[in-house]
Amino acid sequence: MLTEELLQDIFELADLMSNGDRELFLQLRDVVFASDPNQILNSIERILEPDSFDDFLDRVGESEKENLWLILIKLLEHFDYICVRDYKDNLEDFIYFFDRLHQVRNSGISLKLDSDGLNPAASISEWARVIDSKYLYEHFCLGAVDIDTDSYYLFFSKQATFARLQELAGNLGY
């Protein structure tokens, strides 16, 4: 059962991760408060790309809380607040998708223009450490959402926002 506190935390997470994106909020609200499961699926199918929708269907389970978390993550991905990268990603693709994140673009950062320290032979976790150190004094960090896959669900945020995101995710059991 979804509690009022859980819903508040989900909506605050959405607000913080999307910088108050109204379209994302409205999509999340429509899905969360839909009374018919088919209406939820139809809404999600209209929003997501076919591959992302298939992945969503593969992950849907019995837990309302876990399904709501999955919906939030998929919406954030769709609106470019999260990028999903395979653990074996190459640096060129990583940079391309990182640079597309809204928070990255809004901050004026571009790894394509400033990739100093990023070793093409390294892994995503090593690139994340470089990014964190590169933007430490600007108070940004690269975060990841764990949804139990081999992929990284990455987002970029202010460090103070990241602390609140961790707290909210912890409240939800993540």
Predicted regions and their residues:
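Acidic, proline/glycine-rich low-complexity IDRs
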Residues: M1-E5, N119-Y174
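N-terminal "domain-start" segment
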Residues: M1-Q103
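Generic serine detector
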Residues: S18, S35, S43, S52, ...
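Short glycine-rich, low-complexity/disordered patches
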Residues: R22-V32, N42, G108-N119, Y137-T149
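Generic alpha-helix signal with a bias toward terminal, lower-confidence helices
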Residues: I40, I44, F56, V60, ...
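Surface-exposed, low-hydrophobicity interaction/linker segments
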Residues: L76-C141
